[in-house]
Amino acid sequence: MAVSKFIQIRRDLHKIPEIGFKEWKTQQYILDYIGTLSNEHVEVKVWETGVIVKVNGKNPEKIIGYRADIDGLPITEETGYEFASIHEGMMHACGHDVHTTIGLGLLTAAVTERIDDDLVFLFQPAEEGPGGALPMLESEELKEWKPNIILGLHIAPEYPVGTIATKEGLLFANTSELYVDLKGKGGHAAYPHTANDMIVAASHLVTQLQSVISRNVNPLDSAVITIGKITGGTVQNIIAEKSRLEGTIRTLSVESMSRVKSRIEAIIAGIEASFQCEAVIDYGAMYHQVYNHEALTREFMQFVSEQTDMKVITCTEAMTGEDFGYMLQEIPGFMFWLGVNSEYGLHHAKLKPDEEAIEKAIVFLDQYVKWKGTRK
């Protein structure tokens, strides 16, 4: 059975996942598709490996923005798709192929039937890291086209197709990467008293970090410290001179993030003293919380509930990280979850979003944009 135009686009994009600021094929695919629209009212700019598109309205008084992240993840795909990734060790495991396809569908609808206001589409690289939203927002390319209102979405495997979920105010957490390098003194396994073992130091650090959440964060607040990777040592009979911990910090408040980092630094200083080692801390990429504009979100939820076929759910905050939060710091707007009904979750090698969600999203977002684009 033949698949629809936009499902085919999603499958094409799914084949070519690329990591942050290396999305060259994805960028070219987007540009090639936009070229097929060939409309005098469409303007295109390239920024890094992203694309910014403006559709000029008939009688513009504001600019409405839609942001789609376009990068993939360093994950080996296990979906069994015929259209699985052709890039070894990389996969669209967070739905950015779906986000981009919906953006192209919404762009197509906007070109086909122009609204009063201008529309700007931000096909943004590097959401998974090192972060593309903030530099794109600050770029010269976007300066003239900066939206007055902006919206974004993220697929949600746990919600059924035909459903969206969002809330006013805080939606996603503040996030920060965490990298700690420990350096001590290596030695022979038979003479531990002559060395400073960085495997043991790393083990103590991991267990002590967990006390930050239970003893330094308000129980009515939420925070997470996860160490996802530890490396160290060379062979079984040599005491490790170095070790490295890699993890993530997530909090629902800016104040908690500051407190958690302060406690991490104090604990690491204690590890340095206890194990006579040196430690270097790097917080890597840090994403601001996603905080939805209350009035716009409330208006959007009411519109979708009353004037479209989609079901609206009021959800709770999530510890998810999203650099779209930087855009919402400067531009009123909102983000929402789009139900895609997948057995496997985000960042899983077997994530399989239900493709029926794509055209449903294009249809109801087109309805919303046309409605919003004629309101003062």
From Swiss-Prot:
HAMAP family: DapEL (MF_01692). CDD domains: M20_Acy1_YkuR-like. Pathway: Amino-acid biosynthesis; L-lysine biosynthesis via DAP pathway; LL-2,6-diaminopimelate from (S)-tetrahydrodipicolinate (acetylase route): step 3/3. Pfam families: M20_dimer (PF07687), Peptidase_M20 (PF01546). Its EC number is 3.5.1.47. Catalyzes the conversion of N-acetyl-diaminopimelate to diaminopimelate and acetate. The active site is at D69, E128 (proton acceptor). Gene3D superfamilies: 3.30.70.360, Zn peptidases (3.40.630.10). The keyword Hydrolase applies. It comes from Bacillus cereus (strain 03BB102). It catalyses: N-acetyl-(2S,6S)-2,6-diaminopimelate + H2O = (2S,6S)-2,6-diaminopimelate + acetate. GO terms for molecular function: N-acetyldiaminopimelate deacetylase activity. One of its GO terms (biological process) is lysine biosynthetic process via diaminopimelate. Belongs to the peptidase M20A family. N-acetyldiaminopimelate deacetylase subfamily. It is an enzyme of class 3 (hydrolase). Keywords: Amino-acid biosynthesis, Diaminopimelate biosynthesis, Hydrolase, Lysine biosynthesis. This is N-acetyldiaminopimelate deacetylase.
